[in-house]
Amino acid sequence: LISPVRDPHMFTNKGILIPQLALFILQGLTPKKHEVKIVEEEYTELDYEEECDIVAISCLTSNAYRGYRIADAFREKGKIVVIGGIHPSLLPDEALEHADAVVIGEAEGVWEKILDDIENDKLQKKYHVPNPDLDRYIPKDFSTLSKKRKFNLIPLQTSRGCPYDCDFCCVTDIFGKKIKHIPVAHVVRDIKESGGRNFIFLDDNIIGHKKYARELFTALIPLNIRWIGQSSISFANDVEMMKLAKQSGCKGLFIGLESVVESNNHQFTKLKSLEDTKRSIKKILKLLLQYITVSTTHIIK
């Protein structure tokens, strides 16, 4: 299971280092009869002579070109190559020029099928299972991350999907408009079994469903962890939620201010007007910064 770097000649193993969650999802979905090796190219040099039957590569657009080069190299050696991730999901035909099969969207319900099909010599070109059942979210083995300390944050996910359909964003295309939640008990399980203390929630909006967020934050309090995540600017409207997030170990939030240009708002669907943005920023400065550190950004077009 491989996560490519963008450029193998420019390693950036400084600052906030987050491993590719997709690799650990695939590892958890793989039947025990198979041996799995995770290769984060950020830290591990690829061995093209590795004895293996299947090579699975997960990539974004930023590292897709590198991922394709890796795929081509392994295929030349007769290995079966499967590619997935955001970029291949949106451009599966392009990805198929470099792979034997492409996973479109989520891995649950797909990866197991791929392994069975390979064993039975029935591998298909494209695999896609929309809306997989996240109630059976498989445990992740993060123990090696905690022991080796190559990465300083362990990735977690509590939800997928987003009700907003902003022009610039691929989340809705990949995961749909409906927010799907991973049971809180499963999230707590992964945290406890990881042995780590520092985490990042990869959810696009950690408070996308307030009832679930309260349940999650409450369950995190006794775990004594530190975490950062992403949220919509509406977090500023709920002081009690901010306090609960702080108690649960929140140390920082990344909040997107997609645009400060009134005419662009139709592209993002989150804010009704520039005045909404101004009011929310004032609330953040007055309230949110009392509890947690905030980082903001906006999209430049």
Model regions and ranges:
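Structured beta->alpha junctions
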Residues: 59, 63, 87, 103, ...
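Acidic, low-complexity intrinsically disordered segments
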Residues: 1-194
